[in-house]
Structures are given as structure tokens and as C-alpha cells.
A protein has these predicted regions:
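Phosphate-handling active-site elements
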Residues: 89-93
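Short, surface-exposed loop/turn segments at secondary-structure boundaries that line and modulate
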Residues: 3-4, 63-84, 94-130, 134, ...
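N-terminal export signals
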Residues: 9, 15-37
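N-terminal secretory signal peptides
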Residues: 1-11
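Short, surface-exposed charged micro-motifs
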Residues: 55-57, 88, 143, 149-150
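Conserved beta-alpha junction segments in alpha/beta enzyme cores
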Residues: 36-84
């Protein structure tokens, strides 16, 4: 059995309940405000007006630069965010660069905290990579003179599944504007 000292002074039950209520209210109010934080990006994705070029740029050499809009505070979140773009883009990881841009309004809400950076941006980043990959596959298919439906992308290369012909991302981007 545990003995406790009845003479020990601490917080009262009432103080504990009041403190818990205040802390709980702060969490609920703080959390309820989060839904509006990413509203603009969510609306743009739903409306189909999302421009992937704000968050991803590619040059004629096939280098993909992912613009990271969350602060680096020691966990290298840039790698995780760039990876979520790169996986959908089907780009060779050696061709990926990370950029931490200025705080212009075009980047949206640039807050970092609460381990939410990946959670808040994963859907957007996946769509960025997928839309760029689709554009590259369509452009590569056009250069090869084949239907895009029979082409796929992997490791920075678009391949025609029928003939086996290929076009690298750098070949596509050096001859075509996407």
C-alpha cells in the first residue's frame, strides 16, 4: 500500500477541474480554426484550377525543383514534402532539388508547427506530382507519335509500352513547353 501525507499542500480538486476545462477549451477552439487554414488550396484542387507550377518547377535538364513552403526546424521536412511530389512525378530522386522560397502570398499559408507539415500538404503535393507526370507523359507520347494511353513514366523516363521507345524528361522538356 502507498502512504500519502495528508498535510501535503497541492492543488485542490476544484482548481484541477477549472484548469482542465480551460486547457480543453483552448484545444477545441484552436483545433476548430484549422479547417479554414487550407481552404483556398482545397477549393482550388476541387475546382481543377490548381497550378502545379507554383510548387514545382522543372528545367530543360529534367531537374525538378520542389518549392517547400514549410519551415525547416530540424526534422528536414523538406525531404518528406519533396518525396511526396517525386513519387507521383516518377522522377529519379537524383534529379530532385529542394527550394525554400520567400514568403510571397502565392505560396499560401506558410505555417509550421504541430508536426502537421506533411499532413497538411500531402494531398496537394501528390496532385502536383501526378499532374506534372501526366503532362510529361502526354508530351512524351506526342514526341514519339503514339497515344498517351500506351505510355507510362518511371525514373524520369516516358516509355511506349508497345514499341519500347523512350523519351527522358530532359528530352521532353528541352523540346516542349509544358
Amino acid at each position: 500500500m502507498t502512504k500519502f501525507d495528508k498535510n501535503l499542500k497541492g492543488i485542490t480538486r476544484r482548481e484541477m477541474l477549472v484548469g482542465s476545462a480551460v486547457a480543453g477549451t483552448g484545444l477545441v477552439v484552436g483545433y476548430s480554426g484549422l479547417s479554414g487554414v487550407t481552404g483556398g488550396a482545397r477549393e482550388a484542387l476541387a475546382a481543377g484550377t490548381f497550378d502545379h507550377q507554383v510548387f514545382l518547377t522543372m528545367d530543360a535538364s529534367g531537374i525538378a525543383t520542389v518549392h517547400i513552403t514549410k519551415a525547416e526546424i530540424g526534422q528536414h521536412v523538406g525531404t518528406a514534402l519533396a518525396q511526396s511530389v517525386a513519387e507521383e512525378l516518377e522522377v529519379d530522386w537524383n534529379d530532385v532539388r529542394i527550394d525554400y522560397p520567400d514568403t510571397a502570398e502565392k505560396w499560401g499559408f506558410m505555417i509550421t508547427g504541430g508536426s502537421w507539415s506533411v499532413n497538411w500538404t500531402f494531398d496537394r503535393n501528390s496532385r502536383i506530382g501526378a499532374s506534372a507526370r501526366i503532362a510529361l507523359v502526354e508530351a512524351g507520347a506526342k514526341l514519339m507519335g503514339v497515344p498517351a494511353a500506351q505510355c507510362s513514366a518511371s525514373n524520369s523516363v516516358v516509355t511506349d509500352s508497345v514499341s519500347g521507345a523512350t523519351k527522358t524528361y530532359s528530352q521532353i522538356l528541352s523540346t516542349t513547353t509544358i
